[in-house]
Amino acid sequence: MKMRFLSALVIFGLSNAASAENLLDIYRQAQGKDPQLQQAKAQRDAAFEKINETDAANLPQINLGADANYLKTNQNDVKTAGSAGASIGLSQSLFRRSNWLNSDITAKQATQSDVNYNLEQQSLILRTANAYFAVLSAKDTLEYVKANQEALKRQLEETQQRYNVGMTAITDVHEAQAAYDLATADVITAENNLTNSYEGLRQLTGSEYKTLDVLDTQRFSPAALSDGSDVWMKRAEDGNLSLNLQRINKDIAKQQIDLAKTGHEPTVDLTASLGSTYTDYKNTGASYEDGTLNSANVGVQFNMPLYSGGAIDSRVKQAQFNFVAASESLEQTYRSVQADLYRGYNDVTAAIGSVNAYQQSVVSAESALTATRAGYEVGTRTIVDLLDATRNLYSAKQMLSAARYNFILKQLQLKQIAGTLQEQDLVDVNSGLAKG
């Protein structure tokens, strides 16, 4: 029994350990496990199911009824009597324009839910990429601060040795010690940030990850955008999902005006029924006959609203105001998309420049450190200069790492704004990763 329990624990542990180690695998896991996406999917399915409910108003409505009664009186001719009956009724709408408008509105609302689901899929692509590269960035940061700490440790030991033989002052030892202590604090912070960054991935899939594929920096090369910002804006006008949601919302608001106006229109319904009632007379003083009464009727019902206290006119005005609000919301969304698009385009362009600049910065920092160390050896540079040069090198490497990830994410964000973001974009990014 104990072995079975331990085996169950092992199986449970394995089921929560993720085998996927790259961006694409984690995204595909998240597709089936991310609560935010699953919620949007369920809402979409419910919206499409509601179409069946709305369309049912245009189909026949059939009802079955039954009753039983017992009567006791103090009349001389009838003391007691019992009856039982059953009926079936049918009604069919012949003309109710509101039913057809409701069907159209419900279909548009289902389309809205479908667009919203697609929007959440794009959001999941971005959230997965952000969480993934947040981990890689935290790993790089930890690597660089550890390397900086190790370099400062060697400098501290060297400075201590130089002090011991009288080649430097005690202040240099204190400077080196302070720099090393600060680097140690940076390592502690970086380790904690890395641990916390993994939680972003677990939030998406519910699984834990130990190792991830890393960016292949040897093959990484930020390419300039092939199209101008106006071309990207045209794509956004046609494909931005938030913009499409607002367009559908405006169409629905317009139909709501027509729906409100149907309150003034006539309705025509077909009605039909079949019924049968059996009556049993008991203890009667008169000659009442027991028997069954059958009935059948077919009719057409016409209804024309004449006055409802102004309620219908009020509903029409409300719908008209809501249409104005929907129109303004569409315009607001368009302006927001336009601003986001141009900002996003500029961000990608700037990110390319940043990567190139930080690459040169690393080269320059390496040369500066070499020159500063040589100057320190001959006494033309101080220990402070050497410590600063060391920090500058690893800071430049850290900034270059962040710039690379920023470029990737800014490209994905631009594609989302344009409405073109899809799984293939993650496939392309994933192809630039290598085993960590």
Identify the meaning behind each predicted range.
Residues 65-94, 102, 215-226, 258, ...:
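Small/polar, glycine/serine/threonine/aspartate-rich low-complexity segments that form flexible
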Residues 25, 83-85, 130, 175, ...:
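Transmembrane beta-barrel architecture of outer-membrane proteins
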Residues 28-38, 45-60, 88-105, 115-122, ...:
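A glycine-/polar-enriched beta->alpha junction
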Residues 24-32, 173, 207-281, 424-436:
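Amphipathic alpha-helical coiled-coil scaffold segments and their short linker/junction regions
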Residues 406-436:
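Gram-negative outer-membrane assembly/targeting C-terminal domains
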Residues 123-237, 344-347, 351, 392-393:
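Periplasmic alpha-helical coiled-coil/stalk elements that build and connect Gram-negative outer-membrane
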Residues 39-54, 120, 124-144, 154, ...:
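Amphipathic alpha-helical coiled-coil segments
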Residues 1-19:
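Gram-negative bacterial Sec-dependent N-terminal signal peptides
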